C-alpha cells in the first residue's frame, strides 16, 4: 500500500501544474485552503477540493479528463514507472502474489492520469474524488480520504471487501478467512498523515517504511516516525532496480514467502487437531488434559489434586490407562506418593479394570506392594 504525494511523487499533485494554471502561487493556494478549513470547521481535504473547484470557474472546464490530463504531467520518483510490474514479478518468482494499492488524500482522477495508473499498476486507488454532472463537470465531492479514515481501506484490503460502500467491512472475519492478513502488508509513506496506517500495519505484524526525497536528503520526518515507533525502516524514495528501497521490499517479500509456508503448515496441523477432536466430548478432552497434567505434575500437592479430579471420570481407554501408568513410573511427583491412600486407591482401581496386564501395570503393582510393606 502506498501514499502518493511525496511518496511516489516529489511534490503535491495539485502543485505540478493545476494550481499554476488557475493563476495561483502554490503556497498562497494552500494558505487559502487551510484558512477556509480553519474558519469553516471544514475537513482540510474538502477545503482544497472546494477551492480547486471554485478557482477553476471561468478559467478551465473542471472535468475528469481535465484532472487526468494534469495527472499525466505529475512527476514520479526514479524507478516508479517499472516498479510495480518488477515487484510483482519478484513476488511471483517466490510464490507470493503482489497487489499494489494507493491510499491517498490526493485526487483519484489525477492519480488515474499518471503513467503508472494507465499501465494498470494498481489493484485499487483509494483517494478523494469528485461527482460529475450530466455534462461531465465536477459539482461535488464524491469521496474524501483523510489521514484518519485512510485506515478503513486497510481493513477492506485485509478482508477482501474492496467496494467503498460495502458494509461487510464491519463483519467479523476469522484469521484464516482474511484475504490479505496485515502480517503480509507493506505500507510505504512519507509523513505524519500516514501514521494511522503505519501503526495499524505494524500492529498486525506487517511492515511500514518511511521514505524521503533523495535529492534533498531531508530525513527529519522519517527520524520522527522511527523515534515514535511508527516505522521500522526508512529509505530514499528511489524505486529503481537495485536501490535501497528495492532491496528492502524484496527482503520483506522473502520473509512473507517463508511466513506463508509456515502458516500453511500450521493450518494443516490445526486441521489435523480439529479432525482429532471431532466426536470427542468435553469429558474426553477434560480427561486427556488431566492425564497430561499428571505427567507434568511438579509437586505432591498437584498430584493429589489431579488424582481427585481423575477419580470423578471414567477411564476406559487402554491408551489412557497406559498413559496414567506411565506417569506414575516416570514422574517422581507421582511415583513417590503411590502409597498415599487416594493415589493407591486410584491406581489399584485402574489396574483392576484392565483386561490384560501390561508391563506397566505389573511394575505399578510391584510399587504398590512395596509401598504397602513400608507402611
Description of each model-found segment:
Residues 1-134, 225, 229-232:
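Alpha-helical substrate-recognition element adjacent to the catalytic core
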Residues 78-101, 105-375:
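C-terminal cap/substrate-recognition subdomain and adjoining C-terminal extension
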Amino acid at each position: 500500500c502506498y501514499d502518493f504525494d511525496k511518496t511516489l511523487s516529489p511534490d503535491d499533485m495539485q502543485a505540478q501544474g493545476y494550481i499554476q494554471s488557475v493563476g495561483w502561487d502554490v503556497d498562497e493556494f494552500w494558505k487559502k485552503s487551510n484558512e477556509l478549513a480553519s474558519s469553516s470547521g471544514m475537513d482540510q481535504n474538502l477545503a482544497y477540493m472546494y477551492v480547486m473547484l471554485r478557482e477553476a470557474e471561468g478559467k478551465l472546464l473542471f472535468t475528469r479528463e481535465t484532472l487526468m490530463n494534469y495527472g499525466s504531467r505529475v512527476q514520479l520518483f526514479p524507478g516508479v514507472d517499472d516498479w510495480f510490474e518488477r515487484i510483482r514479478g519478484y513476488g511471483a518468482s517466490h510464490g507470493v502474489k503482489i497487489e499494489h494499492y494507493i491510499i491517498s488524500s490526493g485526487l483519484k482522477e489525477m492519480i488515474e492520469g499518471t503513467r503508472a495508473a494507465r499501465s494498470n499498476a494498481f489493484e485499487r486507488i483509494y483517494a478523494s474524488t469528485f461527482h460529475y454532472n450530466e455534462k461531465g463537470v465536477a459539482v461535488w465531492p464524491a469521496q474524501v480520504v483523510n489521514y484518519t479514515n485512510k485506515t478503513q481501506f486497510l481493513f477492506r484490503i485485509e478482508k477482501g471487501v474492496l467496494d467503498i460502500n460495502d458494509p461487510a467491512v464491519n463483519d467479523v472475519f476469522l484469521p484464516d478467512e482474511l484475504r490479505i492478513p496485515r502480517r503480509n502488508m507493506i505500507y510505504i509513506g512519507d509523513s505524519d498523515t500516514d501514521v494511522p496506517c503505519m501503526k495499524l500495519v505494524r500492529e498486525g505484524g506487517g511492515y511500514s517504511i518511511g521514505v524521503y526525497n533523495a535529492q534533498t536528503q531531508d530525513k527529519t520526518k522519517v527520524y520522527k516516525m522511527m523515534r515514535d515507533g511508527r516505522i521500522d525502516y526508512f529509505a530514499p524514495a528511489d524505486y529503481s532496480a537495485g536501490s535501497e528501497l528495492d532491496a528492502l521490499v524484496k527482503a520483506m517479500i522473502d520473509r512473507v514467502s517463508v511466513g506463508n509456508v509456515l502458516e500453511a503448515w500450521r493450518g494443516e496441523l490445526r486441521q489435523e487437531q480439529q479432525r482429532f477432536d471431532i466426536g470427542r466430548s468435553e469429558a474426553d478432552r477434560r480427561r486427556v488434559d488431566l492425564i497430561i497434567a499428571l505427567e507434568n505434575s511438579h509437586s505432591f500437592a498437584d498430584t493429589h489434586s489431579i488424582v481427585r479430579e481423575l477419580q470423578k471420570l471414567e477411564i476406559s481407554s487402554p491408551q489412557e490407562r497406559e498413559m496414567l501408568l506411565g506417569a506414575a513410573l516416570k514422574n517422581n511427583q507421582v511415583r513417590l506418593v503411590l502409597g498415599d491412600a487416594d493415589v493407591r486407591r486410584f491406581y489399584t482401581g485402574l489396574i483392576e479394570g484392565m483386561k490384560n496386564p501390561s508391563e506397566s501395570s505389573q511394575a505399578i503393582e510391584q510399587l504398590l506392594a512395596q509401598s504397602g510393606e513400608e507402611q
